[in-house]
């Protein structure tokens, strides 16, 4: 029996994993009770949504709590795991911008600003794609200030979960529990210095750390 090459394995994975992943996300949403701690509305203005890399699994349901018709792009790395995430989220109506702090960063930054000005919301993992965990990189602040939009912080806290032994301690909810979504009021960082803005975002995203 001929074994698959690395390229063939990846190609197969890109076709199969996103389908299975999207089904699992929907199943876990259906089998968990959802509690939202959030403003009544985020208004009509578009925004940047920030979520830690390790809490990304259930992000579609945080966003669609406010936006029933998704018009959002997520900044996703150009690595293979970024391919898997991008294809999985496409099943929820999410588009992506490919790039990170290490690969395609400037291109992604400029594209993100352009898309925000065109009316898209933008999703960013401030500590992605490779950490350090819970450290806010400059990109989210630069984008918010250049595009003149506010930042909305999202924390996702399941009552029962599996945790992957990875740099981001990636969290996957277990079924038959409660998933709490903590969503902040829009935060204006337009007049703040870089260090102060990053500190504000980090502290806001660690209020319900578990």
Q: In which residue ranges do the predicted regions lie?
A:
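Catalytic core of membrane glycerolipid acyltransferases/transacylases, capturing the structured
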Residues: 45-103, 147, 163
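A generic local structural motif
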Residues: 34-39, 61, 109-111, 167-169
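A short beta-turn/loop motif at secondary-structure boundaries
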Residues: 40-42, 104, 174
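A short, well-structured juxtamembrane/interface segment
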Residues: 23-45, 57-58
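General small-molecule cofactor/ligand-binding pocket signal
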Residues: 35, 97, 182
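Non-catalytic C-terminal accessory region of glycerolipid acyltransferases
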Residues: 1-23, 27, 91, 106-210
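Pocket-edge structural micro-motifs
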Residues: 36-38, 51-53, 76, 185, ...
């Amino acid at each position: 029996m001929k074994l698959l090459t690395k390229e063939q394995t990846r190609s197969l994975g890109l076709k199969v994993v996103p389908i299975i992943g999207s089904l699992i996300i929907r199943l876990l949403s259906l089998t968990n009770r959802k509690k939202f701690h959030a403003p009544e509305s985020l208004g009509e203005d578009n925004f940047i949504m920030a979520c830690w890399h390790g809490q990304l699994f259930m992000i579609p349901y945080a966003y669609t709590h406010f936006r029933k018709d998704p018009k959002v792009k997520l900044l996703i790395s150009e690595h293979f795991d970024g391919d898997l995430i991008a294809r999985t989220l496409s099943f929820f109506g999410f588009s992506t911008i490919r790039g990170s702090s290490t690969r395609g960063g400037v291109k992604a930054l400029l594209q993100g600003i352009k898309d925000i000005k065109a009316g898209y919301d933008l999703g960013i993992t401030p500590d992605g794609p490779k950490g350090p965990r819970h450290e806010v990189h400059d990109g989210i602040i630069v984008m918010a200030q250049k595009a003149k939009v506010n930042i909305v912080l999202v924390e996702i806290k399941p009552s029962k979960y599996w945790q992957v032994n990875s740099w981001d301690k990636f969290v996957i909810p277990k079924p038959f529990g409660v998933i709490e979504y903590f969503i902040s009021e829009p935060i204006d960082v337009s007049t703040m210095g870089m260090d102060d803005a990053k500190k504000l975002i980090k502290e806001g995203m660690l209020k319900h750390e578990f």
